[in-house]
């Protein structure tokens, strides 16, 4: 199959419309991270690239007759998902039934290997190359918040009831709780960024924003006025004080929970959970009906979610040193995880994720 590789801003208006139409036509591709607007936003944040390296879009069928699209960050020897590690989903957006060997895409990108870490289920071309999977949790409120709340309580989940109790308690003790959607407060945005950086410092994790482009990406999406794609800042104030905030990504009928934080001084009242509840109630008044929580085995995700999809990690590679090195790394990981070594068994997987994170931040 003919595959053209172009920079995101080189896509014609027709190609962008075609990409968006293919995504809209398939409910399984309902994610802002799979849209052409995501690829272009990441490209703007990263800045111009030279040569064959940088953010690229593989156009299956060619730019004159596009049948599918896959965005990737292309390096000297390997490629990664566009926007990694800031993207929560990856996948090929293509015509239904389109058959493609993903190794053709790897060859067209001019690399020896394409890694993925959150490949959506249903991506049949990539399924044989997956090395493992985990659930990614979703809240579907298409039937309205009241129906969702009833369903959760029937499932034996008390989280929403507990949030209501804490809301009444904080209003008695500290003052009114105020929810804002599409906040334009730069002060609140900056506070959310600081909360996130503080959390990374306290847990010994890498500050993703220190790489520069991830924070530029957040600022661009926060400032976006595009009705079809962009960021949305949700805030929750207790009295006059910002207690919790989320900068999420929106597209189609989905809001994807992305950057979240709260003031630890209000921990006893769970302001972050109150904010989730307010977002879900707000969805009754807007075209959005799905709050995507992403992957990660957190209690609040298990309790709030009423749907899930599988996301997989793995790689596609041909006969190359890059592919052989990755296969060897996964082999070591499998052996370690099969042994009863406790936390030591997880070290190879953690090392791989750490290296991928650093590669993505370049």
Q: What are the functions of these language-model segments?
A:
Residues 89-125, 182-183, 204, 208, ...:
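Intrinsically disordered, low-complexity, positively biased terminal segments
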Residues 91-95, 150-155:
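Flexible, glycine/proline-enriched loop segments at strand-loop-helix junctions
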Residues 34, 101-102, 145-148, 167-172, ...:
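Short C-terminal domain-edge/linker segments immediately following a structured domain
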Residues 1, 111-112, 175-177, 289:
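A structural micro-motif
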